[in-house]
Amino acid sequence: MVVILWGWNENRFNTLDQVISFDFIEENKKLYLKILENEKQQKIYNISNLIGRRMDNYRDNNNNNGNGSNINNNGIIINSSMGSQYFNLNKGIIIVESDNETFLIEEIDYLGKFPILKQFIKCEEFIGISTLEIISNIEKQLSNLVNLKSNTTEQTDRKYKTNLIDFKESIIQLEKDCKNLLKQSNLINPSIKYSVVKSVKFLLKEIKFEFYHGDINIKRIELFQQLKKFLKIHFWNNPNLILNSGSNIDMTDSNDSISSEEINSPNDLNLSLSSFPSISSPSNSSYNNINTLTFSNNNNNNNNNSNNNNNNNNNNNNNNSIINSNNNNNSNNNSNISNSSNNNNNNSNNSNNISINVSKTGNNSVINSPTQSSSCYIDCDDTMSNYTDCTNTTNTNSTTTTTTTTTTYGNNLNVYNNNNNNNTNNNNNNVPYKKPALKMMKSPSFKIQLIQEVYLEIMDQCKKIQNYLYELLDTYLTDEEYINNNNNNNNKDISILFENNTSYCIAQEIFISLIKNSNDFLYQVQLIDLTDTRKKSKELSEVSNQLFYSTQQLFPSISDHLDFIEMDIFTNNNTTTTTTTTTTTTNTTTNPSNTIKSSHSSLLSSSYSSSKDDDIVLTINKVLSKLDTFSKEYTKLIGNNLSSNYYVDSGNNNESVSSPKCGLFLSHSLSTDSPMTYVKRNTSSGSSASTSSYTTPVSSSASLSFSSSTQTPSSAASQHHIQQILQQQQQQQQQQQQQQQQQQPQQIQSQSQQQHQQQQQQQQQQQQQQQQQQQQQQQQQQQQIQSQSQQQQQLNRKPHYSSISPTSMLVYNATGGKFGVVNQNNNSAESTPTFQLNTMDILNSLMGKEGQNSNTNNANNPNNNNNNNNNNNNNNNNNNNNNNNNENKNENKNETNKSGHNYNNSSTSTLSSSTTIGDLANVSSTNSPNSSTPNLLLPPHQFHNHNREYNHSHHHLLSSSSNNVMINNRSIGKSFSTGNFSQPQPIMPSNGIGGSGGGGLGTTLSVGNGGIVGGLQSRSSSFEENQLQYAIESFMEVYNHLTSKDKVDTSIWLEEEKEDINVYYINNTNIDDKFYRSIKYASLNQLILKLTCESNTELRFTKTFITTYRSFTTGDIFLMKLIQRYFTPNLKNIVPYQFVQKIQIPIQLRVLNVLRLWIEQYPSDFQQPPQITTQSTQPIQNSTTQPQPQPQPQQPQPQLQQSTNLQNSTIQQPSLFKMLTAFLNSTRRNGHGQYSDLILKKFKQQKQKDRLQLPIINNGQGIPKAKIFWMKYSTEFIFSQSSTDIAEQLTLLDFDSYKSIEEIELLNQAWSKPDQKTNTPNIASMVNRFNSFSSFVSWAILRENDIKQRSKMMLKMIKICYALYKLSNFNGLLAGLSGLMASGVYRLNHTKSLISKQYQKKFDFLCKFLDTKKSHKVYRDIIHSTCPPLIPYLGIYLTDLTFIEDGNQDEIKGLINFKKREMIFNTILEIQQYQQQGYTIKPKPSVLGFLCELPHMSDKKKFEDDTYEQSILLEPKNSTKLEVMNAKK
């Protein structure tokens, strides 16, 4: 809505305080506002058809006459009558002062409509929205250019050049707007600001290179979508700054943007207007965001003098400047600490904004201490955290690490000053509020993506704190200075001891930011309002409290810096804190569900065991333990969402710790390459202990631990020290085990001495084997370290992140939730399964470079280290307590692989929490010695879902089994995203009974007392045959009425593109632009392949196909081909994960998108038969009655239909809608349930077109006869009606029929067929009305015997035609001109001579539209230059379609002539573009009834003969004017 105020010289407004009273201008009135430029008084543009607000003069304070007006605080009367509304200051209000002293104030959605106002705009939000609008317009221009370029004619060449100039100008304007936008205030998370700004600048360069210089590269059109994405990210921020006054500011809920229709109370209007933002530089305020502004306080009644004005920044006045972060001082082995002075000029709203910036270069560091800046703001109950920037910049040639930490935050609570200078003038302590909104980003997926950003930052901060604490420990234990100080001053405070330590200071500041971000994270998670998120957030808050309590011992001064955090979280006293901490520590050590400890924590407890009496070591160790628990719990919330069993001990398998709906955090909006958790691979050198300490956050072995991308020498030394201690521990454990074995009771005396000697020999052999295995392990570890160092160099160049670890994907509890299960409650599918997002990671570890070292990946799991050395095979089904005698006492011997891992008989049926991919590969290699490909374990229900043949025949076996089954390794990655195993191995776990079976589907894997008795066998069929068979089976699940696979048409899968054989292109010389070439003619399969191509998104091609497919196929065949395309198999033996990610998934999404467009445009295609509403055959009804239902017209049969096996089958086919529903339900298991629900909702959203309600005929005889009509309506009645009224009501009737014309009526010349009334009712209605009105014009003139009356009637018809021209009703205009130019009327020269010259000129001007030269060039030029609404002459389009149909073949060389369909679509598209915008004319029943009773002349030839005879009687040939005038009536 546009709001306009205008003023004049006598009453000029200086401030908005004076603009108080508004009234609405009457609706439907045109308001023309002229903005003048310079002295030329040149009009720039007009604003018309607006509902504006008129400004009243000022009124005296005493003029309150009780007329609904109220007096505000300043004594200015506010008129509240006539529905007055007030400005919403949260919208973009622009003030423009022109040369004629005219003020323009507007509330607008974007600036594309008013480019001249851009120079006056200072609101970042509307600049951004305008920029997005410009990008959308550029995309439209680009598509128009491509269309013009494809149709090379002389006229299109001129249009192409003109449009190309406009397009390049738009590119330049876009570049300027984007750069101006990036200069605005910081509206985003600082941690991602640099990457976003850098990406936007890079995209601008690419766009300018691809689209401005040289030819247009249509392949790079995705650059604009990427630019939109980054601009939207740039704008996101939680608004929490409220006006700097005591006014009641009403804000919307967190999921809704502020509505322009909200009405502020009159009492608050003055305060709102007085706080109107002044135009200032964006850099003057640190808290500008997209929804609210920092307002200058111009209210004289408010005594709260804030210093945070836009033009006078308090940060500069008080010399409290925040130190910059770019301090690269080259100091030599010195630690320079600069403390800036604090000027305590605290106002009533003073808050401490801490900013500490550290630039670390090797051992030289510069620490800039925080300063206090007084910024006057109030923080409402929403997070406004400029999240901490913790970016690691690594140089591979040196050990230089730059860490910048900035903490400038407003947090979750109302912030008030804690100083003693709080005056009574501060009225900001009780500001009512609602939850602010995400202005531009309201979609849940975007919120979730931003929550993930915060989560990543929290994990990064945990990692940094951990590294700095390790450095602190190394320094404390190795530096003699600290050792001496600690011995001399046992009671010395920790903060005093480490006050000059860089690691200590940085860790403290990062921890402050971590606490803030965790609160922000929890609050945002609660806003998502998913299942169990609120309960989970409470648990996480408790974990945060425990971390805070334990950290207070290490950082005693931390509470001084947390005055603007939610302090109610930390209200417990120190006694309760100590008790809670102790209890928590005890529970974590005694409760089996919490016995999992961090690798770092366990190592520290052993490495510093000699220093247990040292309180500092214990304190740091305690903080590290709590930090690991903290990061682990956060990771569980955002990562482990589907039946997580990673943090639960084997004794508590029945407990559920997951929240299935929380899977949105990983699968709702992220792709496979999106960073979710930090995976550190092959980062450090040393033993297996060092590598095991760097695991993913969702690892099942222990709580989370991190490492930085590069290590400082001190941290590397500590890791090496820990590795040595671990080796010593292992040796001590071996000695203890030997001592325990010696203490065991002696063997039974009845045992012979020979058997005893044999046992001793076996023990010695086993010990030798163990030593050999240890040596082999050490060699493998050394090789692994070398490969890790090489891979780490590549990782440092391009960090690799994965959304979840491969281990967590395979370790799946059988009792948990199922992947991709349809939610039966709301009939919608759950979000995409988590494991689908990790196919890339799994395949990289199995088939890529890392897959070559898959046998050595066991070292990455800390829980497997003890198994390597001691053979502790502790599984759920078989617990062996003795370490070296297990093999002798148990009959189930453990088979040892080459890597030294042992597995008992139960390890193949149940996955433990420490199982890794390398372990599974080793198990498979031992179980199937004849197979060269390792096998993997998979839960039975997971395998059960993907194997459909086995699904039907052995459903009862798999459903009753809870054990895991073995699948072939080759299947991994080929089916995880699609449910499509290329070579499914139906291996059936038996219930403890060995044997074989499976009905020829493979060898059965039976687990009994004898261990593994069976192996795996692959099928004899080839890979391509299995893929094709699976596609056929998937298709037959939808088309379940097919009884044989032979009835399935597989041509779309087998037919390959062969140029000049099954497809012909127009520009076939341009090989580089192959995917964007226009098809001239092709087979139906090739057209479907082009329609759903994975690498192309030609929307125009899609619309052309959907619009014209009826001319060469049927809806049943079209839907069948799309479904077959969805189940496209991998017949070219492409690498499976590449096929899934780059081919299969894009094709499936293209298919669903085509279905969506099809249903949106033509929902009637899915009805049997499609119904077309019309009024042509209805009796004329009263305005209060509804139209009667029409008989269902039959769909015209297309001229070309391809025969398929599906059509030739004798089985009765189900309806099209039923097949569509069955297919959409089948897509849910692939994670496309949300898309399917969206498509199905399109049917419910379809609305019937609004038709004009016509008055009923009194005589009830239907279409009247000619004689009755002429007798009923006299000449006086026609003269009594206004020419404009007749033209307007005729326009309403014509547009009602025109807007109802459907595409099916324009295909195959259906309007010229015998059944045109049923097939093309709306076209028939327009044609009949055209002929009726033309006949009415001729007969109304010729029925007047008096020449004067006849001349007057002719003038009346000319006026009606001219009124039709002014309304842009060219169809009615040409109908009236046809009647005036009929042979019987055209020859009445004496009658024409009585018409004035003025109307004769108008008539001659209108007759130019009838010029048929150059294919109606005059008419086409005028109609193309006219803006809608308009009604074109339908006859010309029907003529064009007839020429296209008759002049072009349907088939060429047996292929579909698609070029002909494009020509048809272009004509139909031009017809449709005028159907969108209608007329705003009120119907008049009396005139409508008169026009509806116009007689229909069935015999046009006879009517023309009758009118010509009547014309001869009125004006005989060779008669004079006088004779005609004297003739008798």
UniProtKB/Swiss-Prot annotation:
GO terms for molecular function: guanyl-nucleotide exchange factor activity. Disruption phenotype: Grows relatively normally on bacterial plates, but is unable to grow in axenic culture due to a loss of fluid-phase endocytosis. The morphology of growing cells appears flattened, elongate, polarized and dominated by a single large lamella. Able to aggregate but not to form slugs, and does make highly aberrant fruiting bodies. Cells move unusually rapidly and have lost the ability to perform macropinocytosis. Crowns, the sites of macropinocytosis, are replaced by polarized lamellipodia. The majority of F-actin is concentrated in a single large lamella, at the leading edge of the cell. Gene3D superfamilies: Ras guanine-nucleotide exchange factors catalytic domain, Son of sevenless (SoS) protein Chain: S domain 1. Residues 1075-1205 form the N-terminal Ras-GEF domain. Residues 135-186, 722-798, 871-898 form a coiled coil. It is found in: Cytoplasm. PROSITE patterns: RASGEF, RASGEF_CAT, RASGEF_NTER. The keyword DNA damage does not apply. Residues 576-591, 683-724, 853-887, 906-916, 924-940, 1168-1187, 1197-1206 have a biased composition (Low complexity). Residues 1282-1517 form the Ras-GEF domain. It holds the Pfam family RasGEF_N. GO terms for cellular component: cytoplasm; plasma membrane; pseudopodium. The keyword Transport does not apply. PANTHER family: GUANINE NUCLEOTIDE EXCHANGE FACTOR (PTHR23113), RAS GUANINE NUCLEOTIDE EXCHANGE FACTOR B (PTHR23113:SF360). Promotes the exchange of Ras-bound GDP by GTP. Involved in phagocytosis, fluid-phase endocytosis, regulation of macropinocytosis and control of cell movement. This is Ras guanine nucleotide exchange factor B. It comes from Dictyostelium discoideum (Social amoeba). The lineage of its organism: Eukaryota, Amoebozoa, Evosea, Eumycetozoa, Dictyostelia. The gene is gefB.
